[in-house]
Design a protein with these regions (language model features):
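Short, basic/aromatic beta-hairpin or loop at an interaction surface
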Residues: 1-14, 193-206, 253
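Acidic-enriched and Gly/Ser
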Residues: 1-187
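Short beta-strand segments
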Residues: 13-15, 39-41, 231-233, 256-261
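A generic structural signal for residues embedded in beta-strands
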Residues: 32, 226-228
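Conserved glycine-centered short motifs in functionally critical loops
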Residues: 156, 160-226, 233-236
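Mixed-charge, low-complexity intrinsically disordered segments
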Residues: 236-237, 271
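Basic/aromatic-rich interaction segments and small domains that mediate binding to polyanionic partners
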Residues: 239-260
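Intrinsically disordered, low-complexity linker and terminal regions at domain boundaries
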Residues: 258-301
């Protein structure tokens, strides 16, 4: 089935649409109908064939390729969103609500105005919605998001010195666990493996597969191995990327010495799976927060 891939916000989720017979290419803007209404989207994937089982049905058609008039309306909407953000801030203050406004967004047809916010708990914003509806004369939706979504919208610089992955290119948040940091021999200090959002860094997922494969070729620290020169010893440390192993071997005079070998020069039993890890309370809380955060609520289009 032929489809195109469309995003509605930077680094947002990609949605499939039916291009019909239109000559739509990557980089174009299109007008499509979504569950939220008529939307203006950016084509990030040109026409291509996708297996039908991978498509969420019903597949909606592209209404049209965006015209200069559509581009102008979209720019006007962005200006209106900035004004709406300021008004909403004033209304939140007026109602004394303990919530942090993050972003505002108009649908292309102006039939709905969405406000994204964070808060520690549930917020009764019914009176606020009535107040906003009276001002903007359109449907109002207030959507509570998590700290990861907040960071995705706001952007920032990671400890690597680069723009945040979630703000730059990540469409969706992948599950991240402390085990990934452990596999990569990283410090388990929460301040070292947490991102700007205070959750585990998304980039821990990037090299998970490679480290898992490399680790499976190595013995565990504490395992006993036999070296190529016939010595038997205990593994002191391993270098995952270099595939080197430091072994405490016993020499003929019963003296002990630390020698370094490439993993191919050692014989040992297959690596034991060590899923159980000692975690302090801070790490455990970080892991629980990851599970509690759940999926993103930015792209419920």
């Amino acid at each position: 089935m032929k489809v195109i891939g469309v995003r509605f916000r930077k680094a947002g989720k990609i949605y499939f649409f039916d291009p019909l017979d239109m000559d739509i290419k990557q980089g174009m803007n299109v007008i499509v109908e979504t569950a939220r209404g008529v939307e203006y989207g950016f084509v990030v994937m040109g026409v291509r064939d996708v297996e039908e089982e991978k498509i969420v049905q019903p597949l909606k058609p592209v209404l049209r390729i965006a015209t200069p008039e559509d581009d102008m309306i979209q720019n006007q909407n962005h200006e209106k969103e900035q004004a709406a953000f300021g008004i909403c801030l004033e209304k939140i203050k007026k109602h004394g609500l303990d919530m942090k406004l993050i972003d505002s967004e108009y649908t292309f047809d102006n039939n709905k105005l969405l406000f994204y916010f964070t808060a520690d708990g549930r917020i009764d914003f019914r009176e606020l919605v009535k107040d906003l509806a009276a001002v903007f004369k359109t449907r109002i939706e207030l959507r509570q998001i998590g700290v990861r979504d907040e960071t995705k919208i706001m952007g920032g610089i990671g400890i690597c010195g680069r723009s945040l992955c979630c703000h730059t290119y990540l469409s969706e948040f992948a599950p991240v666990s402390i085990k990934m940091a452990k596999e990569q021999n990283l410090s388990l200090n929460p301040t070292k493996i947490s991102g700007v959002c205070g959750r585990l860094m998304c980039c821990l997922k990037n090299e998970e597969e490679a480290y898992e494969e490399l680790n499976n070729k190595l013995p565990n620290v504490g395992d006993f191995v036999t070296t190529k020169d016939g010595l038997r010893g205990e593994v002191q440390s391993v270098s995952v990327l270099k595939q080197l192993v430091k072994v405490i071997v016993t020499l003929e005079n019963d003296e002990k010495e630390v020698k370094e070998y490439h993993v191919t020069d050692l014989r040992f039993k297959p690596r034991r799976k060590r899923d159980h890890m000692q975690m302090d309370n801070e790490l455990r809380q970080l892991e629980l927060l990851e599970k509690k955060e759940g999926k993103s609520h930015l792209d419920d289009a």
